[in-house]
Amino acid sequence: MDYLLGLMGGLGLFLYGMSLMGDGLQKAAGNKLKNIIGALTKNTFMGILVGTVVTMIIQSSSATTVMVVGFVNAGLMNLYQAVGIIFGANIGTTITGQMLALNISRYAPIAIFIGVLLFMLGKKKRIKSYAEIVLGLGILFFGMAAMGDAMRPLGESAVYANLMAKLTNPWLGLLVGIVMTTILQSSSAAQAIILALASQNIINMLSLIHI
């Protein structure tokens, strides 16, 4: 039961950190982000590139998709441009997963300290936006570390080991991935949980790929 509470707490920190960082980035960019997107999506390749970069920035392919739909409805973008950006958004999500896989959680407290310091001492809105970015990044990786620590006891559970062995079935792994992402409404959050399990050797590489 303790590991479940730890997982929930870590996931909560991860989601909050991701949201805080995304909000800070959007505030820092302001309307410039929308103008840049509109200007750079004149061809499919640039659309894919923009979709990838924007998703990496705001940490949410769903938010990128919603933004694109809004642009299309407003007549600022055609369907041809939208398809390229949405395709790029899915690529951006995988890059986010690669960032999460890097073992930089030990630097999370430093990022949190710097973020809080900037937020408290900063007078300008732009400085506070930068503070939210740094603080959000720190909280995000702190949440990742918390999930990994919470999952460590599961590695000694025979029942859980047998359950994970079944995930070598590609269709079952795919189903688990779909259900997790649907519930969490964030593929990055789903990846974070899976990577936390993998960091404790609770889930093998084959199962991780399927999910």
PLM features: residue spans?
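Hydrophobic alpha-helical transmembrane segments of multi-pass integral membrane proteins
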Residues: L40-M67, P170-I193
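C-terminal ends of transmembrane helices
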Residues: M18-K27, V68-N73, I114-K128
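Conserved small/polar residues in nucleotide/adenosyl-binding loops
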Residues: I209-I211
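Membrane-embedded alpha-helical segments of transport systems
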Residues: T55-T64, M77, V83-M99, I104-P109, ...
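Re-entrant/interfacial helical elements at transmembrane boundaries that shape
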Residues: A63-N73, I112-V116, A189-S199
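Helix-loop-helix hairpins and the membrane-proximal interhelical loops
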Residues: M1-T44, V134-V179, L197-N201
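Hydrophobic, membrane-inserted alpha-helices
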Residues: G47-G51, A89-G97, I112-L118, V176-G177, ...
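Short juxtamembrane and helix-loop transition motifs at transmembrane-helix boundaries
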Residues: N43-G47, T64-L76, I91-A101, T168-L175, ...
